[in-house]
A protein has these predicted regions:
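Intrinsic-disorder-associated interaction segments
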Residues: 1, 13-16, 20, 100, ...
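Terminal (often C-terminal) interaction modules
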Residues: 1, 5-6, 263-315
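Histidine-centered divalent-metal-coordination microenvironment in nucleic-acid enzymes
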Residues: 45, 51-71, 131-146
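N-terminal regions immediately upstream of nucleotidyltransferase
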Residues: 1-61, 72-92, 96, 313-315
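Generic hydrophobic/packing signal
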Residues: 68-74, 111, 115
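Catalytic cores of NTP-dependent nucleotidyl/adenyl transfer enzymes across multiple folds
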Residues: 25-28, 93-262, 295
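Charged, low-complexity surface segments at secondary-structure and domain boundaries
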Residues: 9-13, 181-189, 236-238, 273-283
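Residue-level recognition of the N-termini of beta-strands and the immediately preceding loop/turn
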Residues: 42-45, 128-130, 266
């Protein structure tokens, strides 16, 4: 038998916000303190991104993602410019006096100065983000020091250029750029049908239930960001279903239909395809595996669940 409506009543809600706003404020205060090494003339903005910003976080959601972006230095994408616009851009720009490499080191050193002590080292940076853990803030935080990423569509002689803004960063020990568009992502997600965000939470909670409570030797290895993008490609006629159980199975039907070409699916920002080979794209086979296992859970709910009264999404 299929998953009952009562289970989706548990799965659709948001998790508690365990202090993300307070954590962001304390990081901003640290970066703005007088002894911070960050260049006084640098234009820096700090904001939340990810599930806490997008209102798709669930009970037990992990670290809060905080972006620290250098806007006075940027990585340009100018392939859309014609030759005249490209020449104007080249003539009007120069190498920055304060580089991204300097900035990200300064952010790391500032956070270490503020939160580390001889007896406690909660600030670490080994991968993409600077991690602040061990109770230094109300919630564990991933801080991403990045620079502005600018996609130019025009650079006129008079007037303002047409630009889409994103963010670009490198892991601490890598050279490959990671590029995404969190503000466009947020705006587009907000403009979707009002059921969109709760549907994302349902699928994230269904994934977590499968991994923790389902009688299976398999698991669902599907990052939350990609689930959010996948559901964004579901038509509004399905998202608007008031019955959450009907909505869930109709989404499975739609996404598993032979009529759908998953290679055409966009990310929420619509700035990049969802599936592909870049470091910000998903593999189609992983999405298909997730859908197959969620379908199995739908079809065999009373046979294979382990009987836990699991109240995901309730704080």
């Amino acid at each position: 038998m299929s998953i009952p409506e009562s289970q989706f009543d548990n799965w659709h809600g948001t998790g508690a916000d365990a202090g993300s706003a307070t954590a962001r404020k304390r990081i901003v205060n640290a970066l703005e303190m007088d002894r911070s090494p960050i260049d006084d003339d640098a234009q820096v903005v700090t904001f939340l991104q990810g599930s806490y910003k997008n209102d798709t976080h669930t009970y037990g959601s992990s670290d809060v993602d905080i972006v620290v972006k250098l806007e006075s230095t940027w990585l340009p994408e100018t392939s859309n410019l014609d030759s005249e616009d490209q020449a104007r851009y080249d003539n009007n720009t120069s190498n920055p006096s304060y580089t991204y490499s300097e900035f990200r080191k300064d952010v790391f050193n500032t956070l270490k100065t503020r939160f580390n002590s001889p007896s406690s080292k909660p600030v670490k940076w080994d991968g993409k983000a600077i991690e602040i853990t061990d109770g230094a803030l109300p919630v564990d935080v991933d801080v991403v020091p990045c620079r502005d990423y600018r996609v130019y569509y025009s650079y006129p002689e008079n007037g303002e250029p047409d630009i889409d803004h994103g963010m670009a960063f490198r892991p601490r020990y890598g050279t490959e750029q990671v590029i995404n568009f969190p503000k466009i992502h947020y705006q587009n997600g907000t403009e979707k049908h009002s059921n969109y965000k709760e549907t994302v939470r349902i699928f994230k909670n269904a994934r977590d239930y499968y991994n923790e409570y389902w009688k299976s030797v398999f698991s669902i290895d599907a990052p939350s960001y990609f689930i959010e993008c996948l559901i964004c490609n579901v038509p509004a006629r399905i998202l608007r279903r008031s019955s959450r159980s009907n909505r869930f199975v109709e989404i499975l039907d739609h996404l598993q239909s032979d009529c759908n070409d998953l290679t055409t699916f966009d990310q929420v920002s619509k700035m990049e395809k969802l599936f592909g080979d870049s470091n910000t794209q998903w593999e189609i086979s992983e999405a298909e595996t997730m859908l197959k296992r969620l379908r199995s859970m739908w079809d065999n709910w009373y046979d294979q669940k382990q009987g836990a009264d699991f109240r995901l999404a309730q704080s």
